[in-house]
Amino acid sequence: MKAERRSIVKKLIASVGALSVFGMAKGSTPQIEEKEVNNVTNYEDVPLFSGSTRMGNMIFIAGKGAHVEPFEIKAHTEIVLKELEAELKKAGSSMEKVLKVNVYLNDIADYQSMNEVYKGRFGKKPPVRTTVAVAKGGVPGNSLVEMDCIAYV
């Protein structure tokens, strides 16, 4: 029984070794895809950040905020979700393909009202989500909420 197991293990190791050598053959080096960026924001003529970045079938959407009146959480949440959706569409994805959302609230007291607008926006299989309240002034500009997300194509 032990000899039989050893024989099987030896064959398995030999097979894995052969596959490794075969995989290292000339010309089999995997091509690394180039990162694709969209909506680049410059600072003093130097690229600062992108509105979205795509690598393979993964899309990373930069934080979106609402910097307009009315300064009310439900209105800002609606604006931010629409901006996320527009950026996802430009990148070839959709709200239903979002895997992860980060929500940054200017005030944790806005949590429930933000949820009222947020619910149902990502289809029947919502993404995982992290929500944090940042210190006053922690959300850039005068937005009451900022969101970013990760999706696939």
Regions found by a protein language model. Give the residues of each.
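Hydrophobic pocket/interface hotspot
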Residues: 84, 103, 114
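Acidic helix-start/capping segments at beta-turn-to-alpha-helix junctions
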Residues: 98-107
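N-terminal presequence-like segments and the immediate start of the first folded domain
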Residues: 2-78, 106-153
